[in-house]
Amino acid sequence: MTFGIDDLPVRDELRGKSPYGAPQLDVPVRLNTNENPYPLPEALVERIAERVREAARDLNRYPDRDAVELRTQLARYLTDTSGHPLDVSNVWAANGSNEVIQQLLQTFGGPGRTAIGFEPSYSMHGLIARGTGTGWISGPRHEDFTIDVPAATRAIDEHRPDVVFITTPNNPTGTAVPAETVLALYEAAQAAKPSMVVVDEAYIEFSHGASLLPLLDGRPNLVVSRTMSKAFGAAGLRLGYLAAHPAVVDAVQLVRLPYHLSAVTQATALAALEHTDTLLKYVEQLKTERDRLVAELRAIGYAVTESDANFVQFGRFADSHATWRKILDRGVLVRDNGVPGWLRVTAGTPEENDAFLDAVREVKKEQHT
């Protein structure tokens, strides 16, 4: 008899579950994980090598435990791009925004506590909640994937969650959440508990609108999380961060592992922040390609959700997984997120997007013959 997971004394709530993960397939065009398709510029690669070489001289020592220089530069980046003044006391960094979320749930969630998100949304919120023993509540959305504010506030009032997740732009739909919606949910959360409200802005640099960082003023229970994986084109770096009241930054340090950010990670992230202007030019190119995908998909005859991210949700399909397979058979990998009738495609290079559009045109024609 084969020994497997079910034979181990794992927690009951983990039994029968599957780990998070998008398919990793060797195909000509991969547009399924919302990566930035542009390699880092050579000048940045050289600067990373210089900074890592400097850091390597001290690898016999532990890194800066609190990543003060990195947090200072992240605060400067947020201030410069949002107009909202922040300093090192407002920023915390970790190994990807998923670790940021994990630390928040370890601090404010956990056994006997709950978190709510409005689905479909970023699935890792619920998965990390489960991993930290936090009860998960799925909140409502309208059919157009916008948040149903009256229903959402009723859900918050009924369940009185300890943590509220709001993703804007939302993943996988791409829809942005207006500031007034965030404020309404924040007020509902404070009246019910009070609760921590986490605004996940992983894709905000691609948005038509502005960051919600200015909402931090006077709202100590509000947190904005970010990542360097998307706009900075550094998915392989694994660097996420949050902005919040200094008390929140102090609180998450109660659960962070010692020396959690390696010296190499800190050095690489600092090098990337030195090249912000160059990297954000790629963001503008991707926004143009994103808008082209929206227009072309609609012209082909697909329904498309309004997108403020670097990806587009399109449909409607009688069998979305079968359509995903037909696109894959043409050498293009997109994402089936499990949203019935819909698929998601990442904005790639113009050449990658052309290949994708050719594939879906063929699929559309095949489905109508």
Swiss-Prot record:
The modification N6-(pyridoxal phosphate)lysine is found at K230. Signal peptide: none annotated. Pathway: Amino-acid biosynthesis; L-histidine biosynthesis; L-histidine from 5-phospho-alpha-D-ribose 1-diphosphate: step 7/9. It is an enzyme of class 2 (transferase). Keywords: Amino-acid biosynthesis, Aminotransferase, Histidine biosynthesis, Pyridoxal phosphate, Transferase. CDD domains: AAT_like. Homodimer. Belongs to the class-II pyridoxal-phosphate-dependent aminotransferase family. Histidinol-phosphate aminotransferase subfamily. PANTHER family: HISTIDINOL-PHOSPHATE AMINOTRANSFERASE, HISTIDINOL-PHOSPHATE AMINOTRANSFERASE-RELATED. This is Histidinol-phosphate aminotransferase.
